[in-house]
């Protein structure tokens, strides 16, 4: 009587060979690229476009909190009734609070190196960084209809003379320093 299939030893050998081949492939990858300002701009732009599309498709109000050391995407969520009175400025959003937005299968937000601080420019009379605003509110709003708070985000390198920036108008059109122009 002949047996069909593979033995456990044969299967273990195949797994070992596949693991060895995978480790050789991974070792042949080039070293990680440096986190240049251009790379940070591309990462932010891709995340912004994803957030704008997702907000329109899912009818959600999203926001972006910008800090000199990075950015974070937020979503406006309903807050439980018993915790509304304990949160400062909770009446501002009428029972809703800003929470970190982490959609499935997407890692949003980012940190920048210390030598590449972010600078956000908002149209007058808005100012950044906010002085009287609570820290939990986003600096930029992405509305479900496709509108967005107009802004210019500068990815600075202290030792670099060229300025790397991204500008977005109220309709969501994006312009970058890679395409030329001035911020």
UniProtKB/Swiss-Prot annotation:
<keyword id="KW-1133">Transmembrane helix</keyword>
<dbReference type="GO" id="GO:0015627">
    <property type="term" value="C:type II protein secretion system complex"/>
</dbReference>
<feature type="modified residue" description="N-methylphenylalanine">
    <location>
        <position position="6"/>
    </location>
</feature>
<keyword id="KW-0997">Cell inner membrane</keyword>
<keyword id="KW-0472">Membrane</keyword>
<dbReference type="InterPro" id="IPR049875">
    <property type="entry name" value="TypeII_GspH"/>
</dbReference>
<dbReference type="GO" id="GO:0005886">
    <property type="term" value="C:plasma membrane"/>
</dbReference>
<dbReference type="InterPro" id="IPR002416">
    <property type="entry name" value="T2SS_protein-GspH"/>
</dbReference>
<keyword id="KW-0488">Methylation</keyword>
<feature type="propeptide" description="Leader sequence">
    <location>
        <begin position="1"/>
        <end position="5"/>
    </location>
</feature>
<comment type="function">
    <text>Component of the type II secretion system required for the energy-dependent secretion of extracellular factors such as proteases and toxins from the periplasm. Part of the pseudopilus tip complex that is critical for the recognition and binding of secretion substrates.</text>
</comment>
<keyword id="KW-1003">Cell membrane</keyword>
<dbReference type="InterPro" id="IPR045584">
    <property type="entry name" value="Pilin-like"/>
</dbReference>
<dbReference type="GO" id="GO:0015628">
    <property type="term" value="P:protein secretion by the type II secretion system"/>
</dbReference>
<comment type="subunit">
    <text>Type II secretion is composed of four main components: the outer membrane complex, the inner membrane complex, the cytoplasmic secretion ATPase and the periplasm-spanning pseudopilus. Interacts with core component PulG. Interacts with PulM.</text>
</comment>
<keyword id="KW-0812">Transmembrane</keyword>
<protein>
    <recommendedName>
        <fullName>Type II secretion system protein H</fullName>
    </recommendedName>
</protein>
<dbReference type="InterPro" id="IPR012902">
    <property type="entry name" value="N_methyl_site"/>
</dbReference>
<feature type="transmembrane region" description="Helical">
    <location>
        <begin position="6"/>
        <end position="26"/>
    </location>
</feature>
